[in-house]
From Swiss-Prot:
Species of provenance: Listeria monocytogenes serovar 1/2a (strain ATCC BAA-679 / EGD-e)
GO molecular function: carbohydrate transmembrane transporter activity
Subcellular location: Cell membrane
Disulfide bridge map: none
Protein name: Putative sugar uptake protein lmo0169
Family per similarity comment: Belongs to the GRP transporter (TC 2.A.7.5) family.
Superkingdom of source: Bacteria
Transmembrane segments: 5-24, 31-48, 53-71, 84-106, 116-135, 151-173, 178-195, 207-226, 232-254, 263-282
Length: 285
Protein backbone atom coordinates (compact mmCIF):
# COMPACT_ATOMS: atom_id res chain seq x y z
CA UNK A 1 0.00 0.00 0.00
CA UNK A 2 2.86 2.39 0.82
CA UNK A 3 4.39 1.89 -2.63
CA UNK A 4 0.98 2.48 -4.27
CA UNK A 5 0.73 5.86 -2.50
CA UNK A 6 4.34 6.63 -3.46
CA UNK A 7 3.48 6.00 -7.13
CA UNK A 8 0.55 8.46 -7.14
CA UNK A 9 2.78 11.51 -7.86
CA UNK A 10 4.28 9.76 -10.90
CA UNK A 11 0.84 8.80 -12.22
CA UNK A 12 -0.71 12.23 -11.63
CA UNK A 13 2.26 14.22 -12.97
CA UNK A 14 2.69 11.83 -15.89
CA UNK A 15 -0.93 12.03 -17.01
CA UNK A 16 -1.30 15.77 -16.36
CA UNK A 17 0.54 16.95 -19.54
CA UNK A 18 -1.57 14.59 -21.64
CA UNK A 19 -4.82 15.91 -20.14
CA UNK A 20 -3.71 19.53 -20.62
CA UNK A 21 -2.85 18.85 -24.26
CA UNK A 22 -6.15 17.06 -24.88
CA UNK A 23 -8.17 19.88 -23.30
CA UNK A 24 -6.28 22.42 -25.36
CA UNK A 25 -6.30 26.18 -25.05
CA UNK A 26 -3.43 28.63 -25.11
CA UNK A 27 -0.68 28.50 -22.46
CA UNK A 28 -2.22 31.50 -20.67
CA UNK A 29 -5.57 29.72 -20.39
CA UNK A 30 -3.84 26.53 -19.30
CA UNK A 31 -1.82 28.19 -16.53
CA UNK A 32 -4.84 30.09 -15.17
CA UNK A 33 -7.01 26.97 -15.14
CA UNK A 34 -4.27 24.81 -13.64
CA UNK A 35 -3.52 27.28 -10.85
CA UNK A 36 -7.22 27.72 -10.07
CA UNK A 37 -7.50 23.94 -9.74
CA UNK A 38 -4.46 23.84 -7.45
CA UNK A 39 -5.94 26.65 -5.33
CA UNK A 40 -9.30 24.88 -4.98
CA UNK A 41 -7.47 21.74 -3.84
CA UNK A 42 -5.29 23.73 -1.43
CA UNK A 43 -8.35 25.33 0.19
CA UNK A 44 -9.79 21.84 0.72
CA UNK A 45 -6.54 20.67 2.35
CA UNK A 46 -6.43 23.82 4.51
CA UNK A 47 -9.89 23.09 5.93
CA UNK A 48 -8.79 19.67 7.18
CA UNK A 49 -5.30 20.56 8.45
CA UNK A 50 -3.82 22.94 10.99
CA UNK A 51 -0.93 24.72 9.27
CA UNK A 52 1.29 27.02 11.29
CA UNK A 53 1.83 30.37 9.59
CA UNK A 54 4.46 33.04 10.12
CA UNK A 55 5.24 36.02 7.89
CA UNK A 56 8.26 34.15 6.53
CA UNK A 57 6.24 31.04 5.70
CA UNK A 58 3.51 33.02 3.94
CA UNK A 59 5.84 35.26 1.91
CA UNK A 60 8.39 32.58 0.99
CA UNK A 61 5.66 30.09 0.04
CA UNK A 62 3.87 32.74 -2.04
CA UNK A 63 7.09 33.52 -3.94
CA UNK A 64 7.75 29.79 -4.35
CA UNK A 65 4.31 29.39 -5.91
CA UNK A 66 5.02 32.28 -8.29
CA UNK A 67 8.18 30.50 -9.43
CA UNK A 68 6.13 27.35 -10.04
CA UNK A 69 3.81 29.30 -12.35
CA UNK A 70 6.84 30.59 -14.26
CA UNK A 71 8.01 27.00 -14.66
CA UNK A 72 4.62 25.54 -15.56
CA UNK A 73 3.57 28.22 -18.05
CA UNK A 74 6.82 27.85 -19.97
CA UNK A 75 6.43 24.09 -19.93
CA UNK A 76 3.01 24.56 -21.52
CA UNK A 77 4.65 26.79 -24.15
CA UNK A 78 7.21 24.08 -24.84
CA UNK A 79 4.39 21.60 -25.52
CA UNK A 80 3.39 23.75 -28.50
CA UNK A 81 7.00 24.08 -29.70
CA UNK A 82 8.40 20.54 -29.46
CA UNK A 83 5.54 18.35 -28.17
CA UNK A 84 4.93 16.56 -24.89
CA UNK A 85 7.13 13.54 -25.67
CA UNK A 86 10.21 15.77 -26.06
CA UNK A 87 9.29 18.38 -23.46
CA UNK A 88 8.83 16.09 -20.47
CA UNK A 89 12.15 14.19 -20.48
CA UNK A 90 14.00 17.43 -21.28
CA UNK A 91 12.18 19.30 -18.52
CA UNK A 92 12.59 16.51 -15.97
CA UNK A 93 16.30 16.21 -16.72
CA UNK A 94 16.91 19.95 -16.45
CA UNK A 95 15.02 20.12 -13.15
CA UNK A 96 17.00 17.22 -11.71
CA UNK A 97 20.29 18.84 -12.69
CA UNK A 98 19.26 22.25 -11.33
CA UNK A 99 17.86 21.08 -8.00
CA UNK A 100 20.77 18.69 -7.47
CA UNK A 101 23.41 21.36 -8.06
CA UNK A 102 21.61 23.67 -5.64
CA UNK A 103 21.47 20.81 -3.16
CA UNK A 104 25.22 20.26 -3.38
CA UNK A 105 26.42 23.86 -3.34
CA UNK A 106 23.74 25.59 -1.24
CA UNK A 107 22.64 22.84 1.13
CA UNK A 108 25.82 20.71 1.22
CA UNK A 109 24.08 17.49 0.22
CA UNK A 110 26.08 14.45 -0.92
CA UNK A 111 28.38 14.96 2.05
CA UNK A 112 30.57 11.89 1.48
CA UNK A 113 32.91 11.00 -1.36
CA UNK A 114 30.78 8.02 -2.38
CA UNK A 115 27.64 10.19 -2.54
CA UNK A 116 29.47 12.83 -4.60
CA UNK A 117 30.62 10.17 -7.07
CA UNK A 118 27.11 8.68 -7.21
CA UNK A 119 25.46 12.09 -7.56
CA UNK A 120 27.70 13.46 -10.30
CA UNK A 121 27.54 10.14 -12.16
CA UNK A 122 23.76 10.51 -12.03
CA UNK A 123 23.98 14.04 -13.45
CA UNK A 124 26.17 12.75 -16.30
CA UNK A 125 23.57 10.09 -17.14
CA UNK A 126 20.77 12.67 -17.04
CA UNK A 127 22.64 15.06 -19.35
CA UNK A 128 23.28 12.22 -21.83
CA UNK A 129 19.58 11.33 -21.58
CA UNK A 130 18.62 14.94 -22.32
CA UNK A 131 20.73 14.97 -25.48
CA UNK A 132 19.27 11.66 -26.65
CA UNK A 133 15.65 12.75 -26.16
CA UNK A 134 16.28 16.00 -28.07
CA UNK A 135 17.70 14.20 -31.13
CA UNK A 136 16.02 14.95 -34.47
CA UNK A 137 16.75 12.67 -37.41
CA UNK A 138 15.26 14.76 -40.20
CA UNK A 139 15.94 18.40 -39.49
CA UNK A 140 14.49 21.23 -41.51
CA UNK A 141 14.68 24.94 -40.81
CA UNK A 142 11.30 25.02 -39.07
CA UNK A 143 11.85 22.00 -36.80
CA UNK A 144 15.35 23.20 -35.93
CA UNK A 145 14.03 26.61 -34.93
CA UNK A 146 11.27 25.03 -32.86
CA UNK A 147 13.78 22.86 -31.01
CA UNK A 148 15.97 25.89 -30.23
CA UNK A 149 12.92 27.80 -28.99
CA UNK A 150 11.80 24.77 -26.99
CA UNK A 151 15.15 24.38 -25.24
CA UNK A 152 15.30 28.09 -24.36
CA UNK A 153 11.72 27.93 -23.10
CA UNK A 154 12.53 24.88 -20.98
CA UNK A 155 15.63 26.51 -19.52
CA UNK A 156 13.39 29.36 -18.32
CA UNK A 157 10.85 26.80 -17.12
CA UNK A 158 13.54 24.97 -15.15
CA UNK A 159 14.59 28.21 -13.44
CA UNK A 160 10.98 28.50 -12.26
CA UNK A 161 10.74 24.90 -11.05
CA UNK A 162 14.11 25.01 -9.30
CA UNK A 163 13.15 28.28 -7.59
CA UNK A 164 9.88 26.70 -6.48
CA UNK A 165 11.74 23.84 -4.77
CA UNK A 166 14.73 25.76 -3.43
CA UNK A 167 12.85 28.64 -1.76
CA UNK A 168 10.83 26.45 0.61
CA UNK A 169 13.91 24.34 1.26
CA UNK A 170 16.00 27.44 2.03
CA UNK A 171 13.52 28.62 4.65
CA UNK A 172 12.90 25.07 5.90
CA UNK A 173 9.15 25.28 5.29
CA UNK A 174 6.98 22.19 5.69
CA UNK A 175 5.08 21.15 2.59
CA UNK A 176 1.88 21.12 4.64
CA UNK A 177 2.38 24.73 5.76
CA UNK A 178 3.27 25.86 2.24
CA UNK A 179 0.30 24.42 0.33
CA UNK A 180 -2.20 27.31 0.57
CA UNK A 181 0.12 30.36 0.29
CA UNK A 182 1.95 28.58 -2.52
CA UNK A 183 -1.30 28.06 -4.40
CA UNK A 184 -2.22 31.74 -3.96
CA UNK A 185 1.21 32.68 -5.35
CA UNK A 186 0.60 30.36 -8.30
CA UNK A 187 -2.73 32.02 -9.13
CA UNK A 188 -1.46 35.60 -8.78
CA UNK A 189 1.63 34.89 -10.89
CA UNK A 190 -0.41 32.96 -13.47
CA UNK A 191 -2.74 35.94 -13.89
CA UNK A 192 0.18 38.37 -14.13
CA UNK A 193 2.10 36.25 -16.64
CA UNK A 194 -0.97 36.04 -18.86
CA UNK A 195 -1.70 39.78 -19.07
CA UNK A 196 0.26 40.57 -22.24
CA UNK A 197 -1.67 38.58 -24.79
CA UNK A 198 -4.54 39.13 -27.18
CA UNK A 199 -6.34 35.85 -26.45
CA UNK A 200 -9.09 35.68 -23.87
CA UNK A 201 -7.94 34.48 -20.49
CA UNK A 202 -11.23 32.90 -19.44
CA UNK A 203 -12.67 30.37 -21.87
CA UNK A 204 -14.12 26.87 -21.64
CA UNK A 205 -10.56 25.51 -21.82
CA UNK A 206 -9.55 27.68 -18.85
CA UNK A 207 -12.13 26.08 -16.58
CA UNK A 208 -11.51 22.56 -17.90
CA UNK A 209 -7.81 22.99 -17.13
CA UNK A 210 -8.72 23.11 -13.45
CA UNK A 211 -8.81 19.30 -13.74
CA UNK A 212 -5.06 18.91 -14.41
CA UNK A 213 -4.49 21.51 -11.68
CA UNK A 214 -6.24 19.23 -9.19
CA UNK A 215 -4.25 16.30 -10.57
CA UNK A 216 -0.96 18.12 -9.98
CA UNK A 217 -2.01 19.08 -6.45
CA UNK A 218 -3.06 15.48 -5.72
CA UNK A 219 0.39 14.29 -6.77
CA UNK A 220 2.01 16.95 -4.61
CA UNK A 221 -0.04 15.91 -1.56
CA UNK A 222 0.71 12.23 -2.20
CA UNK A 223 4.43 13.04 -2.29
CA UNK A 224 4.18 14.55 1.21
CA UNK A 225 2.60 11.31 2.44
CA UNK A 226 5.01 9.05 0.54
CA UNK A 227 8.06 10.83 1.95
CA UNK A 228 6.88 9.77 5.41
CA UNK A 229 5.82 6.27 4.37
CA UNK A 230 8.77 5.16 2.23
CA UNK A 231 11.39 7.85 2.86
CA UNK A 232 12.46 10.88 0.83
CA UNK A 233 14.92 8.94 -1.35
CA UNK A 234 12.37 6.32 -2.48
CA UNK A 235 9.51 8.82 -2.74
CA UNK A 236 11.61 11.22 -4.82
CA UNK A 237 12.87 8.44 -7.10
CA UNK A 238 9.41 6.98 -7.73
CA UNK A 239 7.96 10.43 -8.46
CA UNK A 240 10.34 10.74 -11.44
CA UNK A 241 8.68 7.77 -13.15
CA UNK A 242 5.93 10.07 -14.43
CA UNK A 243 8.20 11.04 -17.32
CA UNK A 244 7.67 7.53 -18.77
CA UNK A 245 3.89 8.00 -18.80
CA UNK A 246 4.00 11.47 -20.36
CA UNK A 247 6.63 10.56 -22.96
CA UNK A 248 4.96 7.35 -24.14
CA UNK A 249 1.53 8.98 -23.83
CA UNK A 250 2.63 11.85 -26.06
CA UNK A 251 3.55 9.37 -28.77
CA UNK A 252 0.61 6.96 -28.40
CA UNK A 253 -2.30 9.21 -27.37
CA UNK A 254 -1.32 12.61 -28.77
CA UNK A 255 0.00 11.19 -32.04
CA UNK A 256 3.43 12.84 -31.86
CA UNK A 257 5.40 11.23 -34.67
CA UNK A 258 8.88 9.76 -34.28
CA UNK A 259 11.15 7.93 -36.67
CA UNK A 260 12.32 4.50 -35.52
CA UNK A 261 15.73 5.92 -34.58
CA UNK A 262 14.19 8.86 -32.68
CA UNK A 263 11.87 6.50 -30.80
CA UNK A 264 14.75 4.25 -29.74
CA UNK A 265 16.85 7.21 -28.60
CA UNK A 266 13.91 8.74 -26.71
CA UNK A 267 13.33 5.47 -24.85
CA UNK A 268 17.04 5.16 -24.01
CA UNK A 269 17.13 8.82 -22.95
CA UNK A 270 14.10 8.43 -20.68
CA UNK A 271 15.62 5.32 -19.09
CA UNK A 272 18.87 7.23 -18.42
CA UNK A 273 16.95 10.13 -16.86
CA UNK A 274 15.04 7.71 -14.61
CA UNK A 275 18.23 5.88 -13.60
CA UNK A 276 19.88 9.22 -12.89
CA UNK A 277 16.90 10.38 -10.84
CA UNK A 278 16.95 7.15 -8.85
CA UNK A 279 20.68 7.53 -8.19
CA UNK A 280 20.10 11.09 -6.98
CA UNK A 281 17.38 9.78 -4.67
CA UNK A 282 19.88 7.30 -3.22
CA UNK A 283 22.51 10.03 -2.85
CA UNK A 284 19.98 12.12 -0.91
CA UNK A 285 19.41 9.34 1.63
Amino acid sequence: MNIVIALIPAVMWGIMPLVVSKIGGKPRQQIIGTTFGALAFAIGVFIFTNPEYTATIIIASFVSGAFWSLGQMNQFRAFTQVGVSKTMPLSTGMQLVGTSLFGVFAFHEWGTTSKLVLGFSALALIIIGIFLTSYQQHKDENSGQNMKKGIITLLISSVGYVGYVVITRWFDISGWDAILPQAIGMVVAGLLFSIKSEEKRFTKQTWLNMIPGVMWATGNLALLFSNKLVGIATGFSLSQMGVVISTIGGILFLGEKKTKKELILVIIGVVLVIIGGTMIGIAKS
